[in-house]
Curated annotation (Swiss-Prot):
It holds the Pfam family DSPc. This is Dual specificity protein phosphatase OPG106. InterPro entries: Dual-sp_phosphatase_cat-dom (IPR000340), Prot-tyrosine_phosphatase-like (IPR029021), Tyr_Pase_AS (IPR016130), Tyr_Pase_cat (IPR003595), Tyr_Pase_dom (IPR000387), TYR_PHOSPHATASE_DUAL_dom (IPR020422). It is an enzyme of class 3 (hydrolase). GO terms for molecular function: phosphoprotein phosphatase activity. Transmembrane segments: none annotated. It catalyses: O-phospho-L-tyrosyl-[protein] + H2O = L-tyrosyl-[protein] + phosphate; O-phospho-L-seryl-[protein] + H2O = L-seryl-[protein] + phosphate.
Length: 171
């Protein structure tokens, strides 16, 4: 087995078939200004203690937040095994990086706060990695977020796309 195939096998194997984690209900602070949440967290964003400048909506449904100055960015994504989310990684990670640099809080969410939003958060954290071992960093971030939130990027296709871009292509 070649190195790339081995890495992909080990990463997918170590993050699959784990105990069934329950869906997270609370918003998680990922970096100083980037938060991960679900649809309910987004609806509650205007009254949150965090003064969000942006909400990144990754659900299929477009909405507004009445009486709010929060800017909503909508990227409609389907949570299935055929959706190519990797084509959004560069734009989303660049946007989240700017939010962090400018101290502009942003909430990234999908319906449950698990797959679509989790994948974008994982991609963002992987894009910031300057370590020499992207495979170990992937496992560290994945398991740390899973410990914090419960379910996190359970969609095997989304995991595979992140692994291919940020782990396999880096080796």
């Amino acid at each position: 087995m070649d190195k790339k195939s081995l890495y992909k096998y080990l990463l997918l194997r170590s993050t699959g078939d784990m105990h069934r984690a329950k869906s997270p209900t609370i918003m998680t602070r990922v970096t100083n200004n980037v938060y991960l949440g679900n649809y309910k967290n987004a609806m509650d964003a205007p009254s949150s203690e965090v003064k969000f400048k942006y909400v990144l909506n990754l659900t299929m449904d477009k909405y507004t937040l009445p009486n709010s100055n929060i800017n909503i960015i909508h990227i409609p994504l389907v949570d299935d095994t055929t959706t190519d989310i990797s084509k959004y990684f560069d734009d989303v990670t660049a946007f989240l990086s700017k939010c962090d640099q400018r101290n502009e809080p942003v909430l990234v969410h999908c319906v449950a706060g698990v797959n679509r939003s989790g994948a974008m958060i994982l991609a963002y954290l992987m894009s910031k990695n300057k370590e020499s071992s992207p495979m170990l960093y992937f496992l560290y971030v994945y398991h740390s977020m899973r410990d914090l939130r419960g379910a996190f990027v359970e969609n095997p296709s989304f995991k595979r796309q992140i692994i291919e871009k940020y782990v396999i292509d880096k080796n």
